[in-house]
Amino acid sequence: MKLEGRNLTFQYDKGDRRILNHMHITLESGERVGMAAPSGFGKTTCCKILAGYEQPDEGEVLLDGKPLSSYRGYCPVQMIWQHPEQAVNPKKRMKDVLKEGDKVETRIIRELGIEEGWMMRFPGELSGGELQRFCIARALGEDKAAAGG
């Protein structure tokens, strides 16, 4: 998969400074990219635009050359939130949390080092790192690209 942000421009309120100013970014399957900037400089906004949660004021997001906006009801780009405890229902066991997304392949669960015993636990019974693995597995599901937030 190839995810592209072309000429992305975004500002929250007209008259405010632009959070993104004609930004270009290309991500290929398997690539890991980090963004470093002070708070308020658009890292999360960029990820939200790349995942389709926000629309840019200018520019476009393409997945394998096809506009991301053309995916109706199914978006192959998913967010992996920075604070995993806020991304899951605390009253559901982890096996049920994984069912909320698309089917998660057993291979992904193994590759992320998720232990079988963790499946019956509630989110509050897992460490932050263990919980993050579940969020990654759920975001990846089948045939997904992931953006961090």
Where in this protein do the model-derived segments appear?
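The feature captures the beta-strand-to-loop junction immediately N-terminal to the Walker
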Residues: 36-38
